[in-house]
């Protein structure tokens, strides 16, 4: 009985054919090396050039490991290779073929910062698919103190990019934690025609109509009435001194002293359910990070 074995060259050819479709103008030198780097990285579960080189077979096994390692390093430091442009081609191809199986057309988009000790910071926007988080857009910064990683303009650029990936048939719902309390960020998402569900810090000021005093009073969002076992919803709340209008959902606080307080431009009744979906995507991405990107 004959048994067919796929070699590294077979896999590489398959990746090359995909890249030719997704990136018609890819350089030949990149087309020849990228598939093998991808295979080596997967096999080694590492992006360290030496680890990748040790896993490569076929023609690479005829070359000393040091030489293969140097070739991989040259690729990573080559100014003609832009990883952001490369990933842009890949993700646009993927999203163009993406179809939702359920009728509501909701797509949950999560943005967050990831840190690797003191080595680097990544601002990443991901799409939740099942129990996985698929990166759509990201920017990397050295160490964990680079202020560029936290600038509003960077976040707005990433959100605008993600918006451009999807046609109007999809309902994009952006989810963010307490790092992202900017009303300008909310306004930007709203201007693109999408929904935001952002968790608020409890010390943010709001202007709330007090029924007893029969006028608006200034208080922190954490001081808004809430219930232990039921969600509470507020519509048309003025947020911060800019008095930006949002809807607010406060989850049941149960045994915790800090319940979820979600600002949304959508239905507050749906906001908590949507925000809960942030965790499946984020946890997956964090596991990816802690396992060198190879958690599946």
Predicted regions and their residues:
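Single, function-defining residue in the core of a domain
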Residues: 1-46, 55, 65, 86-88, ...
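Short alpha-helical "recognition helix" segments of helix-turn-helix
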Residues: 52
């Amino acid at each position: 009985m004959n048994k067919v074995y796929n070699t590294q060259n077979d896999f590489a050819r398959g990746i090359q054919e995909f890249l030719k479709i997704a990136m018609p103008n890819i350089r030949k030198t990149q087309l020849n090396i990228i598939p093998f780097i991808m295979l080596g990285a997967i096999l080694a579960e590492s992006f360290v050039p030496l680890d990748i080189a040790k896993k490569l077979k076929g023609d690479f096994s005829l070359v000393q490991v040091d030489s293969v390692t140097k070739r991989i390093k040259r690729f990573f430091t080559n100014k003609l290779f832009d990883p952001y442009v490369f990933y842009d081609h890949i993700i646009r191809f993927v999203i163009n073929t993406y179809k939702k199986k359920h009728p509501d057309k909701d797509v949950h988009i999560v943005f967050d910062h990831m840190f690797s000790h003191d080595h680097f910071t990544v601002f990443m926007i991901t799409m939740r698919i099942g129990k996985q988080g698929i990166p759509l857009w990201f920017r990397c910064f050295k160490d964990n103190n680079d202020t560029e990683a936290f600038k509003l303009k960077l976040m707005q650029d990433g959100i605008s990019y993600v918006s451009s990936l999807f046609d109007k048939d999809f309902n994009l719902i952006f989810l963010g934690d307490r790092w992202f309390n900017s009303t300008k960020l909310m306004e930007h998402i709203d201007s693109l025609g999408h929904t935001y569900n952002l968790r608020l810090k409890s010390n943010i000021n709001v202007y709330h109509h007090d029924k007893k005093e029969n006028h608006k009073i200034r208080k922190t969002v954490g001081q808004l009435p809430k219930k232990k076992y039921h969600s509470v919803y507020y519509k048309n709340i003025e947020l911060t001194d800019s008095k930006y209008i949002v809807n607010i959902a406060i989850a049941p606080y149960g045994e915790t002293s800090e319940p979820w307080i979600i600002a949304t431009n959508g239905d507050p009744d749906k906001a908590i359910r949507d925000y809960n979906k942030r965790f499946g995507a984020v946890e997956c991405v964090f596991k990816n990070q802690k396992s060198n990107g190879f958690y599946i």
